[in-house]
């Protein structure tokens, strides 16, 4: 549940960055389009968020505490970038 919480948080960050989420968008499309809004330095965080979300949602593998900590850290990185962008406007 924690991973899905952080994924929803990530989606809210994307909305703040101006990404018009569509109900038909899957995680691959969201990641691809988010790369147009975030700096290249954040691409690894975007990929990590998707990878951990897929593991939690579709995989037989258990989500570890490390996975939760990583997606939280990635969301923090993306949120900080979003905050910086908002301050510039």
Regions found by a protein language model. Give the residues of each.
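Membrane-proximal, non-transmembrane interaction modules
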Residues: 1-89
């Amino acid at each position: 549940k924690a991973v899905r919480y952080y994924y929803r948080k990530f989606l809210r960050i994307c909305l703040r960055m101006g990404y018009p989420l569509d109900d038909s968008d899957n995680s691959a499309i969201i990641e691809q389009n988010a790369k147009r809004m975030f700096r290249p330095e954040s691409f690894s965080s975007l990929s990590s968020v998707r990878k951990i979300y897929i593991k939690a949602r579709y995989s037989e593998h258990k989500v570890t505490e490390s996975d939760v900590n990583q997606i939280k850290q990635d969301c923090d990185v993306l949120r900080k970038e979003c905050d910086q962008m908002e301050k510039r406007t």
